[in-house]
């Protein structure tokens, strides 16, 4: 005859079998309840868009879709510095940077395996133009690049060695010099070598006026807000929200400026290591979607469709001589030409330091 202890054990096992759900249901419940973690590395400029709008909206979206909470650990800094940190071991699952050249460096390091340009708009998630910020009332009478190059005008932009935004700034100045050379008073465009010389001259005269080169675009704006400088060269979207909030300066969009596009990509090696590839891919897809795009637009970015950017609905000024990186040969060519060891901007800075 079974003992009383054996009888009790049998009763307990029967109770557990009745009360516990099937294994598959139980594991699904645990998975739905778990908190996933995503590490985001971004350039400094769009911090407010992410922290105030995009990240909370994505967390809500992911919760509704999967039942899971997602915690986003975000890091913001100069684009080039962020790219180097990722290559050096900062294990970000998603990189949102200022320029495609920084993403390409991560690709070359073997950390991004997929073709990130196959995403909508070639992998770009936001757009802007390089603009000039001036003091309220424009006391220096700045209307364009030549005015920023006048003696006695103090200019700010960050350091291209650390800041992707600064690279855009310098490219805008150089490209503007080429555009200006194509419309001389005589009506005949300058020869290529003459246009190049004029572009270098404009770059030299503006660089001579640069008071401080901060590490990032955001630091440069902070310096300008402290009262340093007459003109800041920066993203238009850095200036628009501040003017809207009654900051004491104005925006000048030069006729000659560059069309800016900013990329985002999953960092495959780290996302796979953390087992969050699904979350990372969903986050990047969310950045291309209407909710994130509306947040970018609200904070001064332009629509990725340049035609829409000039529509009456968005009311962005349309520069008459807007140009793109592609017109200057693409990122690989222009970055080497301007910022390489023997680059034009590099030589300008070195020559000015000797004087």
Give the residues covered by each predicted segment.
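N-terminal segment of the mature folded domain
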Residues: 33-163, 349, 353-354
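Bacterial N-terminal signal peptides
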Residues: 11-25
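Short beta-strand->loop
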Residues: 41-44, 134-135, 153-195, 206-210
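Ligand-binding pocket segment of bilobal, Venus flytrap-like solute-binding proteins
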Residues: 180-254
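N-terminal secretory signal peptides that target proteins for export/translocation
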Residues: 1-8
